[in-house]
Amino acid sequence: DVQNSRGAKMPRGDKEAVMKYKFPVPPLDVQREIVHILDSFTLLTAELTAELTARKKQYEFYRNRLLHFESDAQIKTIGDLCTVVTGGEPPTDCIKGEISDSTHQYPVWGNGKEVYGYSETYKIDRDAVVISSIGANTGAVYYREAFFTPIIRLKAVMPKDDKLNTRFLFHALSTTEIKSKSSSVPNMNANEIKAIKIPVPSIAIQNKIVSILDNFDAICTDLNIGLPAEIEARQKQYEYYRDLLLTFAETGSTLL
């Protein structure tokens, strides 16, 4: 019976089904104890999330400060510094989805955060910064590692030489307000991308800035370290104990 199975969701849109939905109701003192335990997990997760938000703001502050130069950097256009490749249609062999297989190993990226699919071939053979150039996500900047194919007018931007660190390019473009000039559907062409200006200090300074910002970025976003890992672990812990406690409330025995 779905209504009585552990973890079943309350039905939606059907008033009669909602009214008949069954769930365990232990004694009030047991309810209070379960609420106390689960609320403590929720509070901890909320505190960690607030701390992560503060760290992200701190990262953005230092990124903006580090990328603001008074006189130690030249101002150049993306067209002077980089090659810009515009994505086209998906490869004919593209398998849509977020999981590759033994033959389709190269990601196909569209204008969003998520991978569009995988292909046996690739168009870009080095690390690049990509810029969404059509739709609501226009102007969003992402870093993509080598061997991928951009599609749906996604712009792949790559330094022409080793005087520009690709990660520095990513951080610099992340602080730049990239806007579409279109009055209808937001979109950007390659010439608009090439006209964007960024500061370019010496490669030694670029590398130092990249080291600082990459470490900060990892602390804020990497699910394997720092606060993101802690939040994910606490969320899993909360879900585990929630199921354990509600199973006890329903049956009198735990999952152990």
Where are these regions (language model features)?
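Charged, alpha-helix-forming regions
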Residues: 1-256
